[in-house]
Amino acid sequence: MSHDDQKSRGAADSGRRNFLKLPLAAGAAGGLAYLAYLSRAEPGKEPKPDPAPRRPVLDEYDEKNIKLAHRVSAGISDDELLFLKQIGLRWARVEFQPDEATLDNMTRVQRRFAAQDIKIFSAVNYVHRSPKIQLGQKGRDADIEQYQVFLRDLGKLGIPVADYDFHPANTYTTATVERRGYQAREFDLDDFRKRVEKRRFEREYSAEEIWDAYTYFVKAVLPAAEKADVKLALHPDDPPVAKMNGVAKIFVHHDGYKKAEEVAGTSKHWGLTFCVGTWAEGGDRMGKDVFEMIRDFGKRGKIFDVHFRNVSGPLPRFVEAFPDDGYLDMYRVMKALREVGFRGAMEPDHVPQLAGDKGIRPAGTAYCIAYMRGLLRRANEEVG
């Protein structure tokens, strides 16, 4: 072997070693970028530099950037918390059951996350799903008061966002199916109507009744949120079907969000958890598409956090998919969010199950975060 051949082989071996050193979370994004860089080189020569210097790229952890995060339960294990740190996450959404959402317990949970350098960006207290609240039943004031205390406690802890939804009697899925070899949730509207649907409560509830219940709830909790400086982030109805199990659903269209915004008035503490997957499920029936929603609410600072999920196609049937495996162009989504200056948290949503995955599904989670990180870095290069 000639001296030049040895030099070329040595450079290639060095490149492979450097690629293998990439952390798991950056493998899918940074690794492919590095291989693309090597591919620009002719055999035995150094890679050619970019023809023009690129603009400075926003650091991933800059406060002005999108905050990659994950949604987890308050009882997450120490190993799972360490895993989140290992894949480079510094933010999380934490979900509390009503009996877990005390100030003492939330303080303990926050300290556990802080020990791994992870901040809690948003929190959920599932007391908001109380049928008394969401159906406007007698006794709801006690549950609403519990939610008000929760908001005050988030303010004391410096947790800036409270996520919630408003869809009593919901059915998320009709089957678990295989897609590209992984396990994912399917919703088939025809199957739901024929096989799954049944009246959930003692009677049916109209859209007017659910609007009355939502208005009562928001009027009661929004002042507490404003006083605590905590933002209320409303998730759309998933799936966006107008009525399920005998109860109307009101956040299945752009008009529903606009009406909810009117209920909240000019408050800066009311906004959206914008679930990209849910909006993609609805397709044309949503009134505005994903990108129009981002421009409408995002430009006005009304998107507080984002659930980043793709689906196989719109209703009447869809399968939840990894971000690279659905019909929506997720790079366009990421770029659109950067263009409107979104700087909230972004979490993978309903992570599909890869072989051997359990708990928080670390393999699937790492896959999603790596893909999202790659899209975000590219969007930052283009947007600045």
Where are the model-predicted features located?
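Conserved, mostly hydrophobic/aromatic
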Residues: 92, 154, 235, 306, ...
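C-terminal segment of N-terminal export signals and the immediately downstream linker at the start
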Residues: 13, 34-71
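Structural preference for beta-strand elements that scaffold enzyme active sites
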Residues: 65-69, 91-93, 119-121, 160-163, ...
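N-terminal secretory signal peptides
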Residues: 1-15
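Gly/Pro-rich active-site loop or hairpin
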Residues: 97-98, 243-258, 263, 278-343, ...
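Acidic (Asp/Glu)-rich catalytic clusters
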Residues: 81-88, 104-121, 155, 223-227, ...
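Short, acidic/polar
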Residues: 73-84, 144-151, 289-294
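Active-site acidic/histidine proton-transfer and metal-coordination neighborhood
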Residues: 23-25, 31-35, 134-271
